Amino acid sequence: MKFRAKIVDLACLNHFTRVSNMIAKLAKTCTLRISPEKLNFILCDKLASGGVSMWCELEQENFFSEFQMEGVSEENNEIYLELTSENLSRALKTAQNSRALKIKLTNKHFPCLTVSVELVSSSSSSRIVVHDIPIKVLPRRLWKDLQEPSIPDCDVSICLPALKMMKSVVEKMRNISNQLVIEANLKGELNLKIETELVCVTTHFKDLENPLLPSDSVSQNRHPEDMAKVHIDIKKLLQFLAGQQVTPTKAVCNIVNNRTVHFDLLLEDVSLQYFIPALS
């Protein structure tokens, strides 16, 4: 089992650092899946137990000038590593304006993801800064729980408003309640609502786009004004919004009535899917 990769392009390095920062805000620990063409950052707190799920995917050729890996076997040419997200984010922050970044799977008394950063001083001399990130190599029997989540057939799909504005609204609502209702319809309307014994507050967003859904979708027979809604933990929504440091190319919210909300984001050439289950 081997893995080594190198980034020399500064724009690619900064983009990879932004992705790592986002993951650190979304998940304390995550699984890094390494395959010949892709890297995935995965969080799979079982939906049945009330946890969120995340699937972040990037094509390795869009980031790395060199990329070599050998999985556990020819038939299973993949590697699954569990790591603390903040450790990777912290290591990459030292790489800003560096000449090159190398990532390698190593064993230094314990399994590590070793990040080597080549820094250049004002006198043009270079020095290497090395970070050894502790990891846990996951055995094959655990892989089945870490596959790409199947996308549920949603009742309503709607494009999100500006995420910074949405975050500002949700932050204010958190001071009133720890639960929130997110609801939307096929007329481009999205509401964020909190209800307590003393107060009911709703923020309305209108004239949003509804992406086209497959012709066999359950939403095809739905009245355009009917709201699909889901009752969620406001902290989980806020954590998702706080993780978005870059304006996405695409941001879609898919609601499965009273079951789950699925956020589908495209950040340049990185895709992010994030699932928040309904409160029971």
From Swiss-Prot:
Pfam families: Hus1
Highest taxon of the lineage: Eukaryota
Localization in the cell: Nucleus; Cytoplasm, Cytosol
Keyword DNA damage in record: yes
GO terms under biological process: cellular response to ionizing radiation; DNA damage checkpoint signaling; DNA damage response; double-strand break repair via homologous recombination; embryo development ending in birth or egg hatching; regulation of protein phosphorylation; response to UV
UniProt cross-references to Gene3D superfamilies, sorted A to Z: 3.70.10.10
Keyword tags: Cytoplasm, DNA damage, Nucleus
Annotated Gene Ontology cellular component terms: checkpoint clamp complex; cytosol; nucleolus; nucleus
Record-linked InterPro entries: Cell_cycle_HUS1 (IPR016580), DNA_clamp_sf (IPR046938), Hus1/Mec3 (IPR007150)
Tissue expression per record: Ubiquitous.
Oligomeric and partner information: Component of the toroidal 9-1-1 (RAD9-RAD1-HUS1) complex, composed of RAD9A, RAD1 and HUS1. The 9-1-1 complex associates with LIG1, POLB, FEN1, RAD17, HDAC1, RPA1 and RPA2. The 9-1-1 complex associates with the RAD17-RFC complex. HUS1 interacts with POLB, HDAC1, FEN1, PCNA and RAD9B. HUS1 does not interact with RAD17. Interacts with DNAJC7.
Family: Belongs to the HUS1 family.
PANTHER family: CHECKPOINT PROTEIN HUS1, MITOTIC AND DNA DAMAGE CHECKPOINT PROTEIN HUS1
Role according to the record: Component of the 9-1-1 cell-cycle checkpoint response complex that plays a major role in DNA repair. The 9-1-1 complex is recruited to DNA lesion upon damage by the RAD17-replication factor C (RFC) clamp loader complex. Acts then as a sliding clamp platform on DNA for several proteins involved in long-patch base excision repair (LP-BER).
Name of this chain's protein: Checkpoint protein HUS1
Organism: Mus musculus
Gene name of the encoded protein: Hus1
